[in-house]
Regions:
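Alpha/beta-hydrolase fold nucleophile elbow
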Residues: 86-96
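Gly/Ala-rich beta-loop-alpha elbow adjacent to hydrolase catalytic centers
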Residues: 95-100, 104
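Serine-hydrolase catalytic machinery in alpha/beta-hydrolase-like enzymes
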Residues: 2-87
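Short beta-strand/loop motif that positions the catalytic acidic residue
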Residues: 143-146, 150
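Conserved alpha/beta-hydrolase "acid-adjacent" motif
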Residues: 16, 151-157, 185
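A conserved short beta-strand
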Residues: 113-126
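C-terminal catalytic histidine-bearing segment of alpha/beta-hydrolase fold enzymes
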Residues: 143, 159-200
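Short beta-strand immediately N-terminal to the catalytic nucleophile in serine-hydrolase-like folds
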Residues: 94-96, 121, 145
């Protein structure tokens, strides 16, 4: 069965940033398609980068409005993947970093699609947004990784997101790395491979 791993990069980055992770993911490369698109908008603060939505003020209201717009951009990407690769959503895992992981979680919780998994790396959502969502009844598994030394997105957001998911009876695993900043550590990669170990 074909597997799709969809990477969603962070703010100011591009699709090339995360695609190299495929070399560390223990999936049969012949059976797996790794897809890492650029976000739809040029980044305001990085000429060579892209953004899923603006982050000028970094306020909750800006985040809410940005996620609403980005939702439809991601929807088009996923619809195209399902059509072009003749797969259903259970054959898709979404790995997001920072802004990309916020979008992945936001999208998955509201869309009635059972993805194989949603992997959030250093970018969970605050309670102010989680509590406003209209949650779909889905069976997607969530893996939430965050470094405790992160000075860009506070790690307590990962704790909040995991608690929220557990309260809604989702399958969720929280992994905190004491020695990791706003990055992806070997511990995160190990956890991803554990999650994928029994992906048939």
């Amino acid at each position: 069965m074909k597997k799709i791993v969809l990477f969603l990069h962070g703010y100011g980055s591009n699709g090339n940033d995360l695609i190299s992770l495929k070399d560390y993911i223990s999936l049969e490369k012949e059976e797996t398609e790794f897809i890492s698109p650029n976000a739809p908008e040029p980044c305001e603060f990085n000429y060579f980068g892209y953004q899923w939505f603006p982050l000028k003020e970094r306020s909750i209201e800006e985040l809410k409005e940005g996620l609403k717009t980005a939702f439809f951009h991601l929807e088009k990407i996923i619809e195209k993947i399902i059509h072009e690769h003749a797969v259903d959503e259970t054959q898709i895992s979404i790995i997001g970093f920072s802004q990309g992981s916020m979008l992945a979680t936001y999208y998955a919780l509201q869309k009635n699609l059972n993805f194989h998994s949603i992997i959030s790396l250093s970018g969970s959502l605050p309670n102010e947004i989680l509590n406003d969502l209209k949650i779909s009844e889905i069976k997607s598994r969530f893996l939430i990784f965050h470094g405790k030394m992160d000075d860009v997105v506070p790690f307590n957001r990962a704790v909040e997101t995991n608690s929220f998911l557990e309260s809604k009876k989702f399958s969720s695993k929280l992994v905190l790395d004491d020695n990791c900043a706003h990055s992806i550590s070997p511990i995160a990669l190990d956890e991803i491979n554990k999650l994928y170990e029994h992906w048939n």
